[in-house]
């Protein structure tokens, strides 16, 4: 089973303010630690993460792709969720451009 997540620049921030775009910075050491840890989970074959870093992004642009490959959905879904949450909470820092 292969599951993926594609992050897209939204037109509004979580608090509702309008956004014209953003830039993202990445802590590569933390990203490697998360991926290495989650790859050890039962049934997981591979995890790939690509993040557009230090480039101006506009509404609708892709920010990130996350792909988790594994044996069965019961193993893959939680790893995708944990990896995504960890990346968003500890790896990336977004600077939003408000309208």
Regions found by a protein language model. Give the residues of each.
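N-terminal, polar/charged subdomain of small-to-medium soluble alpha/beta proteins
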Residues: 1-64, 69-99
